[in-house]
Swiss-Prot record:
Main location: cytoplasm
Name of the protein: Chaperone protein TorD
Places the protein is found: Cytoplasm
Record Pfam families: Nitrate_red_del
InterPro entries, per the entry: Chaperone_TorD, DMSO/NO3_reduct_chaperone, HscB_C_sf, TorD-like_sf, TorD/DmsD_chaperones
Gene3D superfamilies: 1.20.120.1820, HscB, C-terminal domain (1.20.1280.20)
GO cellular component: cytoplasm
Physiological role: Involved in the biogenesis of TorA. Acts on TorA before the insertion of the molybdenum cofactor and, as a result, probably favors a conformation of the apoenzyme that is competent for acquiring the cofactor.
Organism: Salmonella typhimurium (strain LT2 / SGSC1412 / ATCC 700720)
Domain of life: Bacteria
HAMAP family in the record: TorD
UniProt similarity note: Belongs to the TorD/DmsD family. TorD subfamily.
Length: 210
């Protein structure tokens, strides 16, 4: 069997940026069209070539295909997003590192400082939102293409991945348990698989709902 080459830095960067957007805000009508577009299908096909990502990509493809059968799919997805990520009850999956006891408080602020980044004033969510971690990883992967700072950026990438993996499995498990239609559950499983693949732990199994 021919081994597929690992993802390029630019591919990681684009995928992290795409996932950051999906976990940050509800999918609007335009976003729904994009999800079902040939462009996204091609991106998923690229990811699917990696054996460690194939199962989670296939699941997300199924959930995207199922959206065409869902009446008022955009409104339903918005309701799913709200129920999972904006509510504070026990049936949610809050996307904030501080909600998980495994995470050291304020870690993301230190990581951003090391990267020379600041959160935009227009960002109204707490700094430890999942989307900030993913935007940081996107930035770091783009920066890895610049040889003069490659070693420093790679070290910071590893620190960011390790920090994220302290709480991302529990977040993913919460999505699996509390997302009845499964789109965000599948999306979170793909994210976890990509982060583990990026971290060199692609052999670890995806968490399963209890």
């Amino acid at each position: 069997m021919i081994k597929q080459p690992a993802l390029a830095q630019e591919q990681y960067a684009c995928v992290y940026a795409w996932l950051a957007l999906l976990f940050f805000r509800e999918v609007d009508d335009e976003g729904l069209i994009q999800l079902q577009s040939a462009e996204i299908a091609d991106w998923l096909a690229l990811l699917k070539r990696q054996p460690a990502l194939a199962a989670s990509v296939a699941l997300l493809e199924q959930k995207i295909a199922a959206l065409s059968l869902r009446q008022d799919a955009q409104l339903e997805l918005a309701a799913d997003f709200c129920g999972l990520f904006l509510m504070t009850d026990k049936k949610s999956a809050l996307p904030y590192a501080s909600q998980y006891p495994q995470q050291e408080p304020g870690m993301i602020k230190h990581l951003l400082l090391e990267a020379g980044m600041e959160v935009n004033d227009d960002f109204k969510e707490p700094t430890d939102h999942l989307a900030i971690y993913l935007e940081l990883l996107s930035h770091l992967h783009f920066s890895l293409g610049e040889s003069f700072q490659q070693r420093r950026m790679n070290k910071l990438r590893q620190k960011t991945l390790s920090s994220l993996l302290e709480w991302l499995p529990e977040f993913t498990n919460n999505c699996l348990k509390h997302d009845p239609y499964g789109f965000y559950a599948a999306l979170s499983q793909l994210l976890l698989a990509i982060v583990r693949f990026d971290d060199g732990k692609e052999d670890l199994s995806i968490v399963a709902a209890e």
